[in-house]
Amino acid sequence: MTIPYLRPLVCACALAAASSAGAADPVADFYRGKSVTLYVGFPPGGGYDLYARVFAPHFTRHIPGNPPIVIKSMLGGSGAKAAGYMSTITPQDGTSLGMFLDAMTLGKVLGGPGEFDPVKLVWIGRIVSTATVSVVWHTSPVQTIEEAKQRQILMAGTVASNTSNFIPAALNDLIGTKIRVIMGYRGSPDQALAMMRGEVNSIGGMSWEAIQTNHQDWLSESKIKVFYAQGAHRIADLPDTPALLDFAVDERSRQILGLLGSGPDIGRSVVAEPGIPAERAAALRRAFAATMADPAFVEEIRHRHLGLEPLSGEEVQHLVAASVATPAHLVEEARRYIAPRETLK
């Protein structure tokens, strides 16, 4: 993924510099001599873990007091268990951070497990959006959403609770597409093989980064077309590819699709415990902004061919609050799309 133009974070960085220049800094006094734990809701070796390990050593340099950051994997609900742990067990003093599944807030809104309130978590900032797309094979008789309203397309999916299933279900209901999802594929490699063999015409959801890294021939030889982006808004790398809000036909569909597509906008974000002192929350957000603009961090991201599309903690907090504020009757409508459908035999 290319690195889009980094939005200026000058004010935040200036504030951070001013803070560190002061003779007495209670935040630095608190963190000095302590360590911070960054809980990752996935096992080591995956994308979230990689971003956490790239981010942490740079972030620690910008936190007042420079506390070392220890990364711990806490599995369970792709972060829901860790978010609950941070909300009920940890001291809630700013020494515990988390990096969880982008759709964790969506899952909670739809009634998923976890002893946490997404709005009460303190969102520190987003490193990058999660660019997930649906793709169609070049031989598919259906190549666009408009064509999918006229003719059935077979799409590979995984499980009912995955976006590869419930987003097509929502599109079928809200705008009249004829997407038939075949669930039961175990992951992206199985889905890719099924599409190339002609078992299905398309894949419900794949990481755009993974396509660029693992399937360069698909792009160079025009073997696929990106059907749509799974997020509410378009992907910077794919400005001509429609996203979910582009398909909205009225206020009802706009709110439902906005909720279902909220995960990619929240992306790979860093959160802190609810209830931490305001001055520490502000300091962590300033440190995050400074990290995103740090040339050493930007260069490492570039060297590792990772994406960088930062968003401030305040902006992520607003996105989360907007999802949670979705009217209850529309949440109920969205929930019914997450149900078992046709399964691979």
Task: State what each model feature region is.
Residues M1-V10:
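Bacterial N-terminal signal peptides that target proteins for export
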Residues A18-A21:
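N-terminal signal peptide c-region/cleavage motif recognized by signal peptidases
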Residues D25, V36, R61-I69, Y85-S96, ...:
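Hinge/capping helix and adjacent helix->loop/strand transition within the periplasmic-binding protein
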Residues F30-K34, S220-K223, V249, D265, ...:
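An extracytoplasmic/periplasmic, membrane-proximal ligand-sensing/linker region
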Residues T37-A52, L75-S78, A156-T163:
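Extracytoplasmic "Venus flytrap"
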Residues M99-F100, T158, G184-R186, G204-M206, ...:
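Short beta-strand and adjacent tight-turn residues that come in two discontinuous sequence segments
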Residues D102-G112, N165, A169-L174, R197, ...:
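A ligand-binding cleft/hinge motif common to bilobed small-molecule-binding domains
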Residues V119-I127, K178-G184, N214-G263, S312, ...:
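Short beta-strand->loop
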